């Protein structure tokens, strides 16, 4: 089945952004800006084509377990705030969800280690030398947007960004990554990520990529996304997944082939 993986990932990012905005008070379209920044940095490092597409997928899904994490804390009677997030648990949940994606072997560790600092002070105590490069790029992009709310840009803000990166060079971020930023993300590129235009900016940065996936893979991917949506509220619980399963069952009952049943799911 021809399946636009990036299209589905970017659609899911809107739901994830809504949750992250609630909890962390980050600006909307956060996931897409993290993807844009990661792609620009990755391209400057020499990645291209499918490698950039994989990086974008990991970047846009870097906080995919946030809804699940919030739901787990809710069951324990705990409220979730930015200061109460246990980064290690949140990252482990997210990495587990990424395992079903067909390009997982290319992005292994990107979500798990995206909160690691270059000096080894992150949740898993990994230094830059021990952290996958995709995770390092996503970490910088994530922290940058969280700190500066890059939904708006100005010369003054851009200068503050460069100063902040220099201040955190070698501690939060590896010099090999921070030193690329000014060339990889000039102010003109940052301005294209403002507000709703970030969606167009992201589309322009990525190649069109719609590979064939077997039905089992498509169902596995869809199951993860259904879980993410369902964890958004205790009222929905397993609602999306339940509807999908019943739709596929009805298709089989009426004699549809597995391709049609997968599309129904």
Model-derived regions, located:
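Histidine- and acidic-residue-rich, metal-dependent catalytic cores
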Residues: 2-265
